[in-house]
């Protein structure tokens, strides 16, 4: 394990006085885990502390783990050009518990938080404009949740006769098929065209 990252993790944990729930090093990057209510203070510290200087905001991403009690993980990626280090800050939440917006610390987080709200349904408090950014105005649900149907709920297409966009229920071309993935597949007994050389 990289000693510099271990030292950095110890320093951050000491300075943040109990706000870091856990930490780990994977792929030469430090990951720390914090509670939703502490995210603004933690990111402010990581950005402004002289030993850290993680002032380059890379992005925020969302992850859905349906089996967990707090199924959503919001992951903040920061870079310290002066320390030549990256850090990942993870916050877990559920469908009901909002996370404080970090726009005051990193203004570039605005659209990332809107994307996570749109695609996962994670709520951010004190966000100035928390509305959908990628899906259509009347879209129902959050498409990156694991429980969202693969086919969606409606099909959208432009109707040339009506000269407008039309929403229709999903029309699957094939009925639902239940595959038995546990049974072994033996293959065919006959030679397919083009496979004559394989039988010789």
From Swiss-Prot:
Keywords: Cell inner membrane, Cell membrane, Membrane, NAD, Quinone, Translocase, Transport, Ubiquinone. Its main location: membrane. Signal peptide: none annotated. Its EC number is 7.1.1.-. It catalyses: a quinone + NADH + 5 H(+)(in) = a quinol + NAD(+) + 4 H(+)(out). GO terms for molecular function: NADH dehydrogenase (ubiquinone) activity; NADH:ubiquinone reductase (non-electrogenic) activity; quinone binding. NDH-1 shuttles electrons from NADH, via FMN and iron-sulfur (Fe-S) centers, to quinones in the respiratory chain. The immediate electron acceptor for the enzyme in this species is believed to be ubiquinone. Couples the redox reaction to proton translocation (for every two electrons transferred, four hydrogen ions are translocated across the cytoplasmic membrane), and thus conserves the redox energy in a proton gradient. Belongs to the complex I 30 kDa subunit family. NDH-1 is composed of 14 different subunits. Subunits NuoB, C, D, E, F, and G constitute the peripheral sector of the complex. This is NADH-quinone oxidoreductase subunit C.
């Amino acid at each position: 394990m990289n000693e510099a990252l271990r030292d950095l993790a110890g320093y951050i944990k000491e300075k943040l006085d109990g706000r870091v729930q856990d930490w780990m090093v994977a792929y030469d990057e430090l990951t720390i885990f914090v509670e939703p209510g502490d995210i603004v203070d933690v990111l402010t510290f990581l950005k402004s502390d002289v030993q850290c200087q993680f002032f380059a905001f890379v992005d925020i991403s969302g992850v859905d783990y349906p089996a967990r009690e707090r199924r959503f993980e919001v992951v903040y990626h920061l870079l310290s050009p002066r320390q030549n280090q990256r850090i990942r800050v993870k916050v877990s939440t559920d469908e009901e518990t909002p996370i404080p917006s970090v726009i005051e610390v990193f203004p570039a987080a605005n659209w990332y938080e809107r994307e996570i709200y749109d695609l996962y349904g994670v709520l951010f408090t004190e966000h100035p404009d928390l509305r959908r950014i990628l899906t259509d105005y009347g879209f129902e649900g959050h498409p990156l949740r694991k429980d969202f149907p693969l086919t969606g709920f409606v099909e959208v297409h432009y109707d040339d006769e009506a000269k407008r966009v039309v929403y229709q229920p999903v029309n699957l071309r094939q009925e639902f098929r239940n595959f038995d993935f546990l049974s072994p597949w033996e293959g065919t007994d006959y030679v397919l065209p083009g496979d004559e050389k394989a039988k010789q």
